[in-house]
Amino acid sequence: MTTGLDAELIEQGRKLFAGEWQFIWASPSIETLPPMSGLEVAFAGRSNVGKSSLINALTGRSALARTSRTPGRTQELIFFEGPKGVDVRLVDMPGYGFASAPKARIASWTSLIHQFLLGRATLARVYVLIDARHGIKDIDKTVLGALDRSAVSYQVVLTKADEVKVTEMAERIDITRTQLASHPAAFPDVLVTSSRTGNGIPELRAAMARLIGDHRR
């Protein structure tokens, strides 16, 4: 389901997440962001698309990022840092598309995300998580367009793949790739994951290892 990820990259990805990752910062506003350091990789997506679960699966820590059945619980930019020597941070962004949240809160989240994307020189890529069962929705298209306009590199990750029939997944990947073809800031490869089964997690780690290696050359 992914391309160009050989055994060496898979091993680099494993090593990237072999050490202990930890929570370091929560930012409710742009003024409270941590100082820029190393590289940052952010995770965006609709409420309850599985961002926190994916971060937990990547790091091998079941409770590093707090998960909730309540949509819209993550209202801050949550930063996690790798072990000494890795010099990489993961950023769990507020979920979008939660219509029941107060309008003022939605506006605050939107402003925070927009300012973060525009002003973060250490941001290497945003992984936009899309529920594999539902595909790219209108609210996702709005976010992808904003990333294009901000010239922020991003890559789509289909989540909850275990809830889609194997016979249907190839078509869903093709549809997603076709939809992304018109987005200039989108990385062409579509990643497929399941936090519950672990499928696709080694490939996502490998993709991140390649990204980090490219930025450090």
UniProtKB/Swiss-Prot annotation:
In its UniProt record, a GO molecular function of this protein is: metal ion binding
Q: Which UniProt keywords apply?
A: Cell cycle, Cell division, GTP-binding, Magnesium, Metal-binding, Nucleotide-binding, Septation
InterPro entries xrefs: G_ENGB_dom, GTP-bd, GTP-bd_ribosome_bio_YsxC, P-loop_NTPase
Q: Which cofactor does it need?
A: Mg(2+)
Binding site residues for Mg(2+): 52, 74
The record ties this protein, via Pfam families, to:
MMR_HSR1
EngB-type G domain location is 37-214
A GO biological-process term? division septum assembly
Q: Does the keyword Oxidoreductase apply?
A: no
The UniProt function text for this chain reads:
Necessary for normal cell division and for the maintenance of normal septation.
HAMAP family associated with the record: GTPase_EngB
Protein name, UniProt field:
Probable GTP-binding protein EngB
Name the species this protein comes from.
Nitrobacter winogradskyi (strain ATCC 25391 / DSM 10237 / CIP 104748 / NCIMB 11846 / Nb-255)
Q: What is the lineage of its organism?
A: Bacteria, Pseudomonadati, Pseudomonadota, Alphaproteobacteria, Hyphomicrobiales
Q: Which gene encodes it?
A: engB
